[in-house]
């Protein structure tokens, strides 16, 4: 898991 993926996942908070 790279930084970009993490940031994107963090930004897209889908419940």
From Swiss-Prot:
Q: What is its main location?
A: secreted
Q: Which UniProt keywords apply?
A: Antimicrobial, Fungicide, Plant defense, Secreted
Q: Which cysteines are joined by disulfide bonds?
A: none
Query: What GO cellular component entries does it have?
Result: extracellular region
Localization annotation = Secreted
Single GO biological process annotation from the record: defense response to fungus
What does this chain do? Answer: Strong antifungal activity against fungal phytopathogens.
Q: What is this protein called?
A: Antifungal protein 1
């Amino acid at each position: 898991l790279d930084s970009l993926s993490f940031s994107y996942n963090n930004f897209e908070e889908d419940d």
